[in-house]
Amino acid sequence: MEVKAKQLDSVNATASVKIPSGMIKSEVENLAKKASKSVKMDGFRPGKVPVSAVLKRYERELTQDAEQNLFKSAVNSALQELKKENKELVGEPYFEKFDRKDGEIIAELILSFKPEIKLEGYEKLIPEYQTPKVSKKEIDEKKDELLKRFATPEAIKTKRALKEGDFAKFDFEGFVDDKAFEGGKAENYVLEIGSKQFIPGFEDGMVGMKIGEEKDIKVTFPKEYGAAHLAGKDAVFKVKLHEIQELKIPELDDEMLKKLLPGEEKASVEVLDEKLKEQIKNEKLFKLVNDELKGKFADALIEKYNFDLPKGIVEQETDMQMRAAFNTFSEKEIEELKASKEKYQEKRDSFKEEAQKSVKLTFIIDELAKLRKIEVNDQELIQAIYFEAYRYGMNPKEHLENYKKQGALPAVKMALIEEKLFNDIFIPKTEKSEKVSKKEKEDK
């Protein structure tokens, strides 16, 4: 096997590899001999399977394993020549060239190493911003939202017609072709008008009804309705309204304050207002950081700090962005890309600049996290994945296993580190901004 290594820049090197067919064959036979001692095959006793039988059945798998072993050996040889250690590598070696002819393999690999980054003066790049303000109106609206969660429907005493937002207590029975259908009847059913819980047209048909009134409401079941025998059918619902209910929002008394402020010894409107103010401010700040500040800061970091990027990582990121974009391409575009290598390469190259920025920012964030001692442990990682699973109604353990199988845990961890990092950077900044704002007022 021939291996020639060449350093391209501070973080990239090439390894030109030539593996003779005889070496591949020899490695395949060695693996077959080892496998023959443990493999189980009908017609042979354990440990007595002939090498020829193993080769015949598992030649493809053995060849793949043999080539993988030989390339590992080639990479180790290249690292020795470059006077580098395996632990210095970042990402997997990237195949820039791979040719197979007459059993011989000629390949060129890109070996990438972690760049050394100095982020002196990064604090000056943190964008200035005004601390989010919270108005009394916003606090009152948030209080109303909280109280509505404890609201209960109560029958109205005044005589008026049913309107959207009311709760109706009524009987109904549905008919298709003048025949009652199963599951289409109920008594004293309570429905919020406007909630769109019933099929289109039903709730609109009830608007304007008065207590004691009976009415036939004509509707059409959607074509995609769950019950196939009703899908797309015209129907008539005979409805009788018994009661109109309105949501009664509770008073903000001492009892309600205790519910809204559990564990608070001195539960009061003032304490609630202060907590809601802090909550709203944090929500605004979180939105500001994610919608504006993170992007500005990231762009400034990318522009200021320049260093060699690991080519293999950039190529892998480019491939990933290209694959993700495939979901947005039209069938015509996909066919054109499949038919033309030039067009495919041109389209792939269009993602290169964004891939470079993404890789560059990843290394900068990683270095910033170390400078500011930001870490994410395994427990935090698992909790984040479990929370995501609960949010989307998925099995948390299966969701975690899927991330493991896809090799996506490092990406999730990096996203969590990034979130903690930006919080660490911008939250203290708020306190400084408040002090600056106060001083500016005093100076005026």
UniProtKB/Swiss-Prot annotation:
EC numbers: 5.2.1.8
Gene3D superfamilies on file: 3.10.50.40, Trigger factor ribosome-binding domain, Trigger factor, C-terminal domain
Top EC group: isomerase
PROSITE patterns (alphabetical): FKBP_PPIASE
Localization in the cell: Cytoplasm
GO cellular component, one term: cytoplasm
Keyword Metal-binding: no
Organism superkingdom: Bacteria
UniProt-listed SUPFAM superfamilies: FKBP-like (SSF54534), Triger factor/SurA peptide-binding domain-like (SSF109998), Trigger factor ribosome-binding domain (SSF102735)
Free-text domain note: Consists of 3 domains; the N-terminus binds the ribosome, the middle domain has PPIase activity, while the C-terminus has intrinsic chaperone activity on its own.
Function: Involved in protein export. Acts as a chaperone by maintaining the newly synthesized protein in an open conformation. Functions as a peptidyl-prolyl cis-trans isomerase.
The protein, known as: Trigger factor
Organism: Campylobacter jejuni subsp. jejuni serotype O:2 (strain ATCC 700819 / NCTC 11168)
Originating gene: tig
